[in-house]
């Protein structure tokens, strides 16, 4: 047995490489093999006694760990090898325990590996096979390895130098063996990496150097294969795709036998995923996160075809990344060869498609379907549990990622397309990121894909070589008469070019769709402007008519799944126009209101290109509304589609686009309207007066929000809502828009009954509740939406009520005069900056005086800090007099007013659901009601004239009849704090020069005095706040879009599905 107290020390090569010593027994020279690394003569310390302190000083970095038996019994382990004394007496195995992989491991990797190497070397010697003797460090070999040289197979350096080809006598096939996993140098490196933090850091630096070296080498590759010689970037695309691989490869373990959670709702804790206490910025978009997830076994042929069918029936019709015929040929080739002969390219593409297809299966009671013996109709097939061999989508994703590096690092195949296939691989990864949170986040994966597509020049197309022969110089000849040169291309070459061009178009518009979809969801700018795109749509024909020899003419009326894809492409173009115009208007307004400086170098008179040809913003908006309706009415029929993709989701996308079109077209407060300088002819109603169409805007927003929620409810009842993360996002956005319109518009309240409002709220919360076990962030969204809906209904019942009782005549009469005056004043005289600031100070003083004279108003406390796990302001909230949990039904007011209709006193379940809204002011009295502000609305972002931008507190009050005039799209009542008005600072004071946020952060309990805000990641007005801290804002979707801890946790259940 080995004894650590042995005075005669002999070190292993690993110990020398690490700079630390581990005692070994002295072996007789006759018994030790000459090639055994542990028997090599290595230099001893000059002073033998100097080695003893070295052992003691390295005890904290020992390579031997306590055994699992002593750990479980909480006994002190003597750490003897190969067995400790306790295990030796008990006669049991003495093994260690890995807390990350949750499995038993050898107590000493070094001892275990050295013993194994010695045994294998002895086998080689017994069979007369020569091999290189191991040395402590081969500098020449290491330089070649780090430089990325291919191993010279069959050379004298042997397996330590690279890859060798071992001939199989039975099938005469070459088996490639990786040097770093099987060679002694790789074993030594692996053991040092696991046991030494310093060596681990050095290894990470080495990996980074390798990627950087690869990027540098690829940057020198000559330009080949691009349609336009002006794009001189990396034509292979590896420099971009490897960034994605570096981020996502850490999501899978190195050993496929390691198992992760078996059930969808079991998630690893932060300590297991390695993301505790880190943010997206800390980990460089998740590059340092290393969660463990097992790899799925390669499915049998029947299961593979069913998973692929699910992908092509439900996912590919929306974003047609993959050519179906080409993919099925790849599947046939893969299953026709031996497992060892399958290429990394085929294994990656097949596994990532299996991952997406497995997520489409939505089932709760698969056993019942099997017991009843239902036939496999399309709907039954989707809900059917495939077999016991079915793995989770994350596990198929893990199996795909382990092959991504080999696929990207190998040369293009004879039947492949090099960089185009690498872009296709990234797009498939983005498609899976729609299904599950994946590091580094959907936003960053799509960004990499867009930049790779632009790098390949896919956005630019001029028809050269196929449609424009006059622009091509290949194979030109002049005739005798000196006529214009003509291009001669044979049919085979033309067919090949048509195939490649359609492939490029397909990938570009898939990348474009991803970019527009994600950017519109999160409210970020696009990766490329529409004005820079000249690429046409791909062919609308079914894939079987698009061959490598050319495009075949399809029969008249032949169905094609691309009808859905084309319809989605058109929608993304419309969404792109809407988002571009709204962001342009917001930026123009911010530049006009902001301090001078950079704007002196900008063209402030330039309007959005999409507004050219329209006399006003409203005319453009009406035109877009008309085009959206035409898009909805021109949706393809199921007979045209030819797949099982439910077309009801197209209508859902229409109403979501309507919300997007109108959510920032809401009115400015009356007091700000007369302080803004006259707008140009083309301006957003958010920055001018919109009294002529205000009711229409609110009504459209409310109708669209209600439609989205009800359609999701209907789809959920038939098990079609499987994109759980996007569904959570869309339902929450639609619900907020619906409540917002009710809060601010008596006209909307007059068109709705309390039962209709209650049904819509119940539909949203019920779907979110059902999605919770598949999408954990849905719980926080549901809780927040429930609280906001209760506050909205309570406020409405205490003021105007719902239905015909709402007196619109009085509301409109009381506000028309003031608006007419404000509109006239705003258009009649231009205001200087000094005059505007003076009027703002005067109006702020008047509002302060009004608030001091008014009675205290109820505070809306949504308890949002409970949703986000931040309880630092719980004590403050408990003492602030916030509304508690109200269980009593709404008490009918006893005050009577013949001129003010109130809801009837009958009880119904809807009224029992909501608690009382305690309004201290009688409805008929002209007492002021609060003007609720959304402290970071687009109108106020960067505006020095905004009181809310300075204090985050509602600055003034108005009568109940004026509360339909909001400041901008948002949850303004969340930050309402009437007690903080007197703390408001004057806009002209020096203390307020930095526009610090005060009231809102305190009410949310997230660090008073800092502008953290609530970044829901939804692209709403809350998202326009400036983040002055290094802390990440709240993210209800747990890193779905932007990575972070939530993007690396495995096992969220089935979440992909039929509609995005």
From Swiss-Prot:
Its main location: nucleus. Residues 170-182, 189-207, 260-269, 367-377 have a biased composition (Basic and acidic residues). Residues 67-94 bind DNA. The keyword Metal-binding applies. GO terms for cellular component: nucleus. It holds the Pfam family Zn_clus. Residues 1-48, 163-207, 251-282, 367-391, 811-862, 877-969 are annotated as: Disordered. Residues 832-859, 930-952 have a biased composition (Low complexity). Residues 1-15, 272-282, 811-831 have a biased composition (Polar residues). It is found in: Nucleus. One of its GO terms (molecular function) is zinc ion binding. GO terms for biological process: DNA-templated transcription; positive regulation of transcription by RNA polymerase II; purine nucleobase catabolic process; regulation of DNA-templated transcription; regulation of gene expression. It comes from the Eukaryota. Keywords: Activator, DNA-binding, Metal-binding, Nucleus, Transcription, Transcription regulation, Zinc. InterPro entries: Transcription_factor_dom_fun (IPR007219), Yeast_MetPath_Reg (IPR052202), Zn2-C6_fun-type_DNA-bd_sf (IPR036864), Zn2Cys6_DnaBD (IPR001138). Mediates the induction of a number of unlinked genes involved in purine utilization. Binds to the consensus sequence 5'-TCGGNNNNNNCCGA-3'. This is Positive regulator of purine utilization. It comes from Emericella nidulans (strain FGSC A4 / ATCC 38163 / CBS 112.46 / NRRL 194 / M139).
């Amino acid at each position: 047995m080995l004894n650590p107290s042995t005075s005669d020390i002999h070190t292993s090569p690993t110990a020398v490489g690490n700079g630390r010593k581990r005692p070994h027994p002295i072996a007789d020279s006759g018994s030790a093999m000459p090639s055994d690394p542990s028997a090599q003569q290595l230099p001893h310390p000059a002073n033998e006694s100097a080695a003893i302190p070295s052992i003691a000083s390295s005890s904290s970095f020992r390579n031997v760990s306590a055994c699992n038996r002593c750990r479980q019994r909480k006994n002190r382990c003597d750490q003897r090898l190969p067995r400790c004394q306790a295990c030796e007496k008990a006669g049991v195995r003495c093994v260690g325990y890995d807390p990350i992989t949750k499995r038993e491991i050898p107590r000493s990797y070094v001892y275990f590996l050295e013993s194994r190497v010695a045994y294998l070397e002895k086998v080689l010697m017994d069979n007369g096979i020569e091999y290189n003797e191991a040395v402590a460090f081969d500098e020449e070999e290491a330089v070649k390895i780090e430089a990325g040289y291919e191993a010279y197979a069959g050379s004298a350096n042997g397996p330590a130098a690279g890859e060798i080809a071992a001939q199989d006598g039975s099938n005469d096939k070459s088996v490639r063996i990786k040097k770093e996993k099987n060679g002694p140098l790789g074993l030594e490196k692996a053991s040092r990496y696991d046991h030494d933090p310093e060596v681990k850091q050095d290894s990470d630096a080495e990996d980074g150097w390798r990627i950087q070296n690869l990027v540098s080498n690829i940057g020198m590759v000559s330009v080949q294969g691009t349609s336009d010689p002006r794009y001189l970037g990396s034509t292979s695309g590896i420099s971009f795709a490897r960034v994605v691989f570096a981020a996502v490869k850490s999501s899978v373990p190195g050993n496929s036998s390691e198992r992760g959670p078996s059930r969808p709702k079991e998630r690893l804790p932060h300590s297991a995923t390695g993301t505790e206490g880190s943010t997206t910025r800390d980990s460089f978009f998740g590059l340092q996160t290393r969660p463990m997830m097992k790899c799925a076994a390669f499915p049998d042929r029947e299961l593979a075809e069913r998973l692929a069918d699910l992908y092509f029936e439900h996912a590919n019709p929306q974003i047609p990344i993959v050519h179906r015929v080409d993919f099925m040929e790849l599947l046939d080739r893969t299953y026709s060869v031996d497992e060892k002969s399958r290429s990394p390219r085929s294994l990656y593409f097949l596994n990532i498609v299996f991952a997406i297809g497995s997520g489409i299966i939505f089932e709760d009671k698969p056993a019942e379907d099997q017991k009843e013996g239902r036939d496999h109709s399309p709907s039954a097939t989707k809900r059917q549990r495939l077999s016991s061999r079915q793995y989770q989508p994350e596990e198929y994703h893990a199996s795909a990622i382990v092959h991504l590096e080999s696929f990207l690092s190998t040369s293009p195949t004879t039947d492949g397309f090099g960089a185009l296939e690498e872009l296709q691989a990234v797009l498939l990864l983005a498609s899976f990121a729609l299904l599950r949170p994946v590091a580094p986040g959907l936003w960053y994966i799509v960004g990499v894909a867009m930049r790779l597509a632009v790098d390949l020049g896919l956005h630019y197309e001029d028809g050269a070589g196929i449609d424009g022969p006059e622009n091509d110089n290949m194979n030109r000849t002049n005739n005798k008469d000196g006529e214009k040169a003509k291009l001669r291309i044979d049919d085979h070459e033309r067919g090949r070019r048509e195939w490649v061009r359609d492939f490029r178009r397909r990938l570009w518009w898939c990348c474009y769709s991803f970019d527009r979809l994600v950017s519109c969801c999160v409210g970020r700018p696009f990766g490329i402007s529409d004005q820079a795109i000249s690429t046409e749509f791909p062919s609308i024909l079914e894939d079987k008519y698009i061959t490598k020899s050319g495009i075949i003419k399809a029969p008249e009326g032949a169905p094609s799944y691309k009808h859905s894809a084309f319809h989605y492409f058109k929608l993304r173009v419309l969404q792109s126009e809407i988002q571009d115009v709204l962001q342009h208007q917001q930026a123009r307004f911010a530049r006009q209101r902001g301090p001078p400086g950079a704007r002196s170098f900008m063209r402030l008179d330039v309007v959005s290109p999409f507004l050219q040809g329209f006399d006003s913003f409203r005319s453009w908006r009406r035109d877009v509304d008309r085009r959206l309706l035409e898009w909805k009415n021109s949706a393809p029929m199921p007979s045209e589609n030819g797949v099982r993709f439910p077309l009801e989701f197209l209508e859902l996308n229409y109403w979501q686009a309507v919300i997007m079109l109108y959510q920032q077209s809401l009115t400015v407060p009356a007091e700000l309207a007369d302080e803004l300088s006259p707008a140009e002819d083309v301006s957003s109603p958010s920055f001018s007066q919109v009294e002529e169409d205000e009711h229409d805007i609110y009504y459209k927003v409310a109708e669209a929000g209600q439609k989205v929620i009800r359609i999701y409810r209907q789809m959920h009842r038939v098990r079609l809502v499987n994109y759980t993360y996007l569904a959570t996002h869309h339902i929450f956005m639609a619900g907020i828009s619906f409540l917002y319109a009710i809060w601010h518009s008596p006209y909307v309240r007059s068109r709705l009954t309390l039962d209709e409002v209650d049904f819509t709220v119940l539909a949203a919360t019920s779907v979110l509740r059902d999605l919770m076990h598949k999408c954990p962030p849905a719980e926080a969204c549901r809780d927040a939406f429930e609280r906001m809906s209760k506050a909205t209904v309570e406020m409405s019942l205490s003021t105007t009520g719902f239905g015909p009782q709402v007196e619109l005549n009085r509301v409109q009469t009381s506000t028309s005069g003031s608006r007419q005056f404000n509109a006239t004043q705003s258009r009649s005289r231009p205001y200087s900056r000094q005059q505007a600031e003076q009027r703002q100070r005067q109006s702020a003083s008047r509002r302060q005086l009004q608030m001091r004279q008014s009675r205290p108003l109820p505070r809306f406390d949504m308890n949002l800090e409970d949703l986000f796990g931040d309880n630092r302001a719980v004590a403050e909230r408990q003492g602030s007099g916030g509304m508690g949990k109200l269980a009593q039904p709404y008490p009918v007011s006893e005050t009577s007013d013949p001129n003010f209709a109130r809801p009837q006193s009958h009880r119904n379940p809807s009224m029992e659901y909501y608690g009382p809204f305690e309004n201290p002011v009688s409805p008929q009295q002209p007492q002021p009601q609060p003007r609720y502000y959304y402290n970071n609305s687009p109108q106020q972002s960067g505006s020095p004239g905004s009181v809310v931008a300075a204090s985050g507190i509602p600055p003034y009050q108005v009568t109940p009849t004026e509360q339909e005039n909001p400041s901008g799209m948002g949850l303004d009542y969340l930050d309402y704090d009437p007690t903080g008005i007197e703390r408001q600072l004057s806009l002209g004071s020096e203390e307020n020069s930095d526009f610090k946020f005060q009231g809102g952060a305190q009410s949310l309990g997230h660090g008073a005095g800092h502008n953290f805000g609530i970044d829901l990641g939804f692209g709403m007005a809350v998202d326009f706040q400036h983040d002055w801290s290094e802390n990440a804002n709240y993210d209800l979707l747990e890193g779905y879009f932007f990575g972070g801890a939530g993007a690396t946790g495995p096992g969220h259940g089935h979440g992909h599905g039929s509609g995005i």
